[in-house]
Amino acid sequence: MNGMGERDELLMLAVRDGDVAKLGLLFDRHHRVLFDYFARMTGDRAAAEDLVQDVFFRMLKYRKTYRDDSRFTAWMFHIARNARIDHHKKRRGEVMFPEEGMEVPSRSPFPNQELEQQQETGLLQRALFKLSEEKREVLVLSRYQEMKYEQIAELLGCEVGTVKVRVHRAIRELREVFFKLSGEKASWNAKKSETSLRII
């Protein structure tokens, strides 16, 4: 069996038990998700690429810690968070700003609308990086990674209610920062942009 139809958990159990080639299948499935997480948390594409590689290196190194009842995605993101925290410690004191081109390209067939959406997405990324790391992370996990509150609570080691409160506060602050950067009032029409709607 080539492993293409196997669940992540079964693949990781195979890696743990010595079939390390299966890690390549897990990489193919999850490297984009991890890159998106790291890119939005660090604002640095090169660092995001390095961190993705680091996660899979750590998976291989610590494969024996993977338990029979572990959920692969939760285990993977625990490793990813540790890798990001270590990276942050090394770069402590540096001011992070999202790189040019970090925005998700628009698919709008209308040039003016596309430009407007790109500008709003850029503002949204700038606003995101003005939040604390804790608030930025809960937004990245809940909105970009589309993780359920229960999954985030498990990852962060807190109650589901705590996650809901953190997300609510983070969205409120992000909205305030976004409006401040854009110079628009809080009465801004939410239907104006699907791009911004995804977060605020």
Predicted features and spans:
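Internal acidic/polar
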Residues: M4-D8, E94-Q117, K191-R198
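Amphipathic alpha-helical segment used for protein-protein interaction
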Residues: L13, D17-V20, R92, R107-V140, ...
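Amphipathic, Lys/Arg- and hydrophobic-enriched alpha-helical face
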Residues: F27-R45, Y62, L128, V177-K180
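Arg/Lys-rich amphipathic alpha helix in sigma70-family domain 2
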Residues: K61-D68, H78-P98, P109, Q117
